[in-house]
UniProtKB/Swiss-Prot annotation:
G2 as annotated region, ranges: 423-427
Residues holding GTP: 398-405, 446-450, 500-503
Protein name according to UniProt: Translation initiation factor IF-2
Stretches assigned to the tr-type G domain: 389-560
Provenance organism: Rhodopseudomonas palustris (strain BisA53)
SUPFAM superfamilies per record: Initiation factor IF2/eIF5b, domain 3, P-loop containing nucleoside triphosphate hydrolases, Translation proteins
Region annotation (G5) ranges: 536-538
Localization, UniProt: Cytoplasm
Amino acid sequence: MVDTKNPGDKTLSVSPSKTLTLKPRVEQGTVRQSFSHGRTKQVVVEKRGKRRIGGEGGPADAPTAAAAAPAPAPAPVPSAAPRPAAPPPPSRPQQSRSQSPSRSGSGVVLRTLTEDERSARATALADARVRDEEERRAAEAEVARRNSAEGIAQAEREAAEARRKAEEERHRHEEEAKRKAELEAKRRFGEEEAKRPAAAATPAKSATPAARPTGAPAVRAPGVAAEAGDDDEGPRQVRRGPGGAARPVIPPKQPAAKPAPSKQRGRLTLVTALTADDVRERSIASFRRRTQRLKGHASNEPKEKLVREVIVPEAITIQELANRMSERAVDVIRMLMKQGAMHKINDVIDADTAQLIAEELGHTVKRVAASDVEEGLFDVVDNSTDTEPRSPVVTVMGHVDHGKTSLLDALRHANVVSGEAGGITQHIGAYQVTSPESGKKITFIDTPGHAAFTAMRARGAKVTDIVILVVAADDGVMPQTVEAINHAKAAGVPIIVAINKIDKPDAKPERVRTELLQYNVQVESLGGDTVDVEVSAKNKTNLDKLLEMIALQAELLDLKTNEQRPAEGTVIEAKLDRGRGPVATVLVQRGTLKVGDIIVAGAEMGRVRALISDQGDTVESAGPSVPVEVLGFNGPPEAGDRLAVVENEARARQVTSYRAHQKREKAASLTGGMRGSLEQMMSQLKTVGRKEFPLIIKADVQGSLEAILGSLEKLGTEEVAARILHAGVGGISESDVTLAEGFNAVILGFSVRANKEAAAAAKRNGIEIRYYNIIYDLVDDIKKAMSGLLAPTLRETMLGNALILEIFNISKVGKVAGCRVTDGTVERGANVRLIRDNVVVHEGKLSTLKRFKDEVKEVQSGQECGMAFENYTDMRAGDVIECYRVETIQRSL
């Protein structure tokens, strides 16, 4: 229900958005309600007339008039709070008046509602209930949302409160320290300055009792909550008795608190000013402001420009350049913008631009290259007075099965050949042998003789002092023998020829000496300067003479080095051991390698955890020409990498990061170089149809892995090639099986095995894992598998020719050619060509071959027959039918 414009109209009206109400006959008025702090609000109130009989109006109005009479106003007090107004009496709700109209002063009786009005009222009440239910649900959802938000906000507030308390505690400690410092300074200032404020405070104390009564009011109004002598902090509590008279509640007296120190008191009030024992001192905030002012004046003074020497590499970021110059990066970017270049703070600029910026800002520039991090690692010249003789390093080289390892076993009194798979050497090994005559040690390096291990032989020749060329007396000079000669000459080391297997009946040492002349190796017996010794590793013949020749050659070389310097060496072999981690076989060439040294080899670094000799013993250090196994690398280095000891880990990280970057760039240039050239595009078009054989290779050492990759690379052709998805050192893991599953690849394990999880995953996913111990078997199997991907060769074999004499139309068969075989034979089911005027018009197969209405398999030359083609009928007299057979021949690599 809504009220109409006419206040006297009592008719009912229904609004669809409001509930049904009855408009009462009331009179309205306004009352101004007062609040604390001087705030007021105008409130609309309802005036109700009360029916009075006779002269009862006089006595009824008496209490109201008495209550409305204002109390005498007290004298104005500055510190008293404003008197709050009494709240208006609660008004009765309109619903009670509507429900009981007979009690109103007007005495009006409502009429009975009609059916339409009752229906409208019921509809309005139903709508109101639905709306109330929706509002209740919305309110509950809002409360739930606020509760969750309040929980998060509460946690944030608690964290902020903890930070604030910690900050306040820190400030409190700082202020306490400053306060103590100021007290100490005042104490030193002198006692006279402290007496003067005390004398000035004495008359103020005597005047305090007389000043207090003047500030108190003479008469206090009821309900006023101020107390004489108090601050404007809040009103006093007022208690009213049963008669309505207000009486103040007197709070219990508190014990007088001790006066706080002058440094800790707050605002200056009248009471504190009159009762203070000394003059007010300077506050901590004032002292802090003065200090900040002095600092501000000092900062406004012009500062002297600091000139720095800036090290500028080949490429540097703007942020790094600004840090090295102690300048703001914004200033550097602004200078680049003046030159017309837009850059961000993390952009990389070249050395020339960086030098220009640094010089413009007044700094000096020192240009360095990225490779300068490797300066001082190798080839440091030693003082000749600090050098001492060292043992020679001898590399045994030669063709496969010429007895290199057997000769070394005879010298070492060991049996290495039996430990190698297939009785052939597939790893490079380093050993030390003590000469029985001189007692001096000789370091031997055994290299494989297979064609696949060319890189191993090259590494052995680089780190050696003397090369022993082993040639079998019954076999002579072979391809790998020639390769070993070339490696030795490239390294510039002397050669000692060991003619082995002289115990065999067909041994011909003179033939070996003569064949060596073709490769510029002239032995002493033929007038040259190359030493040759006839030995037998099986019978241990002339081994002492061979050791004597090695010692003599070492004396001629005068091998010396400094043992008291950081170690340098070469990684002979590297592998990933399951129990020990990355293990590298290192030949120390200069200095002494100790446990705990920080080492760098290639792109890997580490700290030496243990050193193991060739005999399997753990040692604390390794001197020059000593081969050891080094444990402690972060990852297995590559065979052939040079090892160096650095002073700290920071230098090691710089070197390894530079080398890793160079390695990535080299790999990127090999794979993505010349992509835009025409030749590269043409080669890519040719290799689009090339089939790939995906492989994952895991080997025991880096050298074997390198040899396998080189051999597989040579197997590739224009039609098929091996695609190496991953190649690494160590056992076959589950991640290798997962990678093979994605590309349907074959996993090859060379002298390694798969762990239990990897084997189970391979069996579950159908991934083939092949294990090998001999490199030749691995290469042969991959060669056969890749040959299966080659398209077979198709070869045609001519059978014979036939001439068509006449064409016959036969029902249910179609056209049949009557032919005479001119040469050879014609077979049913063979491939045929239809030639007309020396032009091939059709190629297909014979569907029918008859002779005198009988199906035959073949027809000989000179005989007549009937022929029909499959799905072809356009045959004419005079055409020639050529019959041939296609043979499929499997290809191989």
